[in-house]
Amino acid sequence: CTIASAGGMISNPKMSVYAASKWGVIGWSDSVRIELQEMKSDVHFTTVAPYYINTGMFDGVKSRIIPILKPEYVAKRVFRAIERNKAFRGIPFGFHFIRFWQAILPTRVFDFFFGKVFGIYHTMDHFTGRKSTKESAGKAS
């Protein structure tokens, strides 16, 4: 199982390097999955792409419609995807359809819905991220 990110399926301002790494993970995982399938291997490959998870890594992220995910919820979905031999699973449900919507909608329409309606393009506006141990210790003094 490979844990990627929804950031590997949908571009987001202020996340270009992160998105590039996750796009790479998704492409690599899918290629390995196909290679194993072509070899008729009994090894199965599951790639999971969750939305923001409340682990501290994305502190300050604000999501208008889609809730920030709890780690326990994501863990259950990951295990379920593995048990069911799913090749790809977006979390929450429906995120695995992003590629479909990108393929059929004109870019302006896709950007309108995901940027303006869902607010995804502004989720990082107040991002602070997880504070390092040194930063936290300095504030405590």
Where are these regions (language model features)?
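A transmembrane-helix-recognition feature enriched in membrane-embedded lipid enzymes
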Residues: N85-I120
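Active-site helix of classical SDR
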Residues: S21
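Active-site loop immediately N-terminal to the catalytic Tyr-X3-Lys motif
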Residues: S11-S16
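Short, flexible catalytic-loop segment of classical short-chain dehydrogenase/reductase
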Residues: P50-G60
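Hydrophobic alpha-helix immediately C-terminal to the catalytic Tyr-X-X-X-Lys motif of short-chain
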Residues: G24, W28-L36, V48
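Residue(s) in the substrate-gating loop at a strand-loop-helix junction
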Residues: S5
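C-terminal helical subdomain
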Residues: T47, S63-R99
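Active-site-adjacent segment of SDR/Rossmann-fold oxidoreductases
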Residues: I10, S31-V43
